[in-house]
Amino acid sequence: MSEGKWEEIVYPEVSGRAMMIYRNAFRKHDEKRFNQYLAKALDGKEKIHAETLYPYDLVEKVLYGRQWNQVLEAQWRQLPDYVAQETNAIVIADVSGSMSGRPLATSIGLAIYFAERNRGAYHNLFMTFSQKPEFVSLRGETLLQKIKYVERTEWGMNTNLQAAFERVLETAMDHDVPPEEMPKALIVVSDM
């Protein structure tokens, strides 16, 4: 990069954090080749590193930099799956007015991350942070659309964990959820 040899950069070998930081420079100086690489990365045909990134890293760029682009989308899709194979976990996401910065990005990022990986009746579900917690079905095709959706969910100034457990059980009973698909954890993400 410092020598201006953009055509020699092997994009699948660029670390996740470097890709996130220099994505605009790659596009500016090597647009055609970089866009071809990104198209393949979005389709899963080419590796784009994301192993050193956390969900909040990508969500922060979208929330505060309004910088959603194909690099962030491809990296989101290739984030490592840290969730055990047979584990459902429900995130209770606080998106209240007191949440900002990294706490808000963490809450939204984990809500989306776990919702996408849950199976069965809990797939694409997260829970609101409220006195009367409710399940919310994640909507949107892109990371940007999902972030905007989670950001607009209803919230309260507190949460009732007993009511959250009851909602999990009600959903299980309503959908005849087998024991192996029951959530193994409720993850409360809040600045309280």
Q: Which residue ranges define each predicted feature?
A:
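Long lumenal/extracellular ectodomains of secretory and single-pass membrane proteins
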Residues: M1-T106, E116-M192
